[in-house]
C-alpha cells in the first residue's frame, strides 16, 4: 500500500480497488483478474464479517487470511501481491454495549487482525456505544482510535511494521449499506477532514504514537457518492473541489466507501481527485447474483423440471423464512419486498449465499449446466456482454467462467479508473 500511495502522491494517476467481500467466487474473480499483471490485489474484511468471535461469516481474522490464501493457491496468485485489510475496525459490532466493554473488545479485534497479518487497518471508533452521547465528540473518537492504534503497534512485529498502514475517519453511511432511501448526500467539508486529521494527530502523540502517524496513509471521507436499494448518487467533481485541494497539502490520500455502481469515468475522476482507494462490495455480489439468476434461466430452458436446481425458489424460501438480514432494510409491502430481495442495489442476498440450502442449489445449478452445451444464442439472451467476450475468443462458455467474467465486469470499470493507460 505504501508504494501505491507514494506513487500517487508523486503525481501518477494511480489508485487501487478495495474488494470488500468474503464470497469465494468474488475473491477468485479478483485474483484471476490480476493474475497476469504486476498489480497488487487488496481484499478487505469488515468487523461484522470477520472478528475474534467469528462474525457473520464464522471466520476469525486468521481463518479469513487462510481462506483467501487458499483461493490464491488454487488459482496460482502469489501471496506477495496480496494485501489484506480490515475495515471499520472498532466498536461497530458492540455499539449496544457500554463504551468500556466495547473498546476492550475492539482492542482485541485489532490485535487479532494484526497478528493474522492484515496490513491495512481502518481505525474507526466513530460510532456511539450504549452509554455515549450521539454524535460522539471528535476528540473522543480520535482518542479511541489512538487506543486501537496502540494495540496494533504493540502487536505488530518489526517486519509487519514495514508494511503496516492505517486509515482514519469514517464516511456518513453506516457500514453495510443504507437502511433507508437517499435523496442527497453530504459531501465532507475540507475543514472537517482537517479536524479529523488534527484530532487524530493530537491523540496519537498523547500516547507516544508519533512513529505510527507516519503509517496513516488515508482519511475516509464522503466525496458525494452513495447508493440505496433503487438509486445511485453519482460523483460530481465540482462539489468536492475544495476537499480535493486540501488533501494535496498532506502526505495522504482519501479512501472512498460506497463507490459501487459509479461509472468508469467517475472512477477515473475520483482517482484524479485523490480518492486513491475505492471500496467496492455489493456491486460485486450484485454481479454474482445477476450471473446466477441468468444461469437459472438457462437451466429452465435446458434441464427437465424434475432435474432442476430450483435455485431461485430456494433463495426465496430461505430469505422469507429467515428475514433477519433484509427485513429492516426493505419495503414492508410483500410485492415490493420481493423486488427488493431479488434486485436491490444494496444486495442483501449476499448474506444468504453461505446458507446450506442455497449453496447446495447453486452447486446443483452449476453441475446441471456443466453436463450440457450452453447454446451461444442462450448466452446472448441472458448474458450479452459475456456473449461478446465469447465471440472475441477470450472466454470459454462454462457456468463457472461465466460467473467469474460477470463479476469481472465490475472490476474492469475500476481498472479503468485506477490505471491511466487502460482505455
Swiss-Prot record:
Signal sequence residues: none
GO biological process, one term: phosphoenolpyruvate-dependent sugar phosphotransferase system
Keyword Zinc attached: no
InterPro entries: Aldolase_TIM, GatZ/KbaZ-like, GatZ_KbaZ_carbometab, TagBP_ald_GatZ
Keyword Calcium: no
Record's GO cellular component terms: plasma membrane
Cross-referenced SUPFAM superfamilies: Aldolase
Described purpose of this protein according to its UniProt entry: Component of the tagatose-1,6-bisphosphate aldolase GatYZ that is required for full activity and stability of the Y subunit. Could have a chaperone-like function for the proper and stable folding of GatY. When expressed alone, GatZ does not show any aldolase activity. Is involved in the catabolism of galactitol.
Entry's family note: Belongs to the GatZ/KbaZ family. GatZ subfamily.
NCBIfam families linked to this entry: agaZ_gatZ (TIGR02810), PRK15052.1 (NF011626)
Descriptive protein name: D-tagatose-1,6-bisphosphate aldolase subunit GatZ
Organism name: Salmonella choleraesuis (strain SC-B67)
Organism placement in taxonomy: Bacteria, Pseudomonadati, Pseudomonadota, Gammaproteobacteria, Enterobacterales
Gene: gatZ
